[in-house]
């Protein structure tokens, strides 16, 4: 779940914080896809903030890393649960 906007999660570098580093997010997906025999799915937010959103580019990178399906949440992480 790379879409979790909860500060407690994001400050550890997990959840939506991974959107700040698409290559790190791709490495996570790549490692998971290699480690399991079931499809790896990913949920992302459209970006960290509305002005830095790049959901298509992020989704394409995660697909190339091995994600079988990607769900894009329409709000940015900064918008939390508004």
Predicted regions and their residues:
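Flavin-dependent oxidoreductase catalytic cores
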Residues: 1-82
């Amino acid at each position: 779940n790379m879409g979790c906007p909860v500060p407690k999660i994001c400050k550890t570098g997990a959840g939506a914080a991974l959107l700040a580093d698409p290559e790190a997010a791709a490495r996570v997906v790549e490692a998971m896809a290699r480690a399991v025999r079931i499809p790896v799915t990913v949920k992302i937010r459209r970006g960290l903030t509305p002005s830095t959103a790049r959901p298509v580019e992020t989704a394409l990178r995660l697909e190339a890393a091995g994600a079988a399906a990607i769900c894009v949440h329409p709000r940015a992480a900064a918008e939390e649960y508004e």
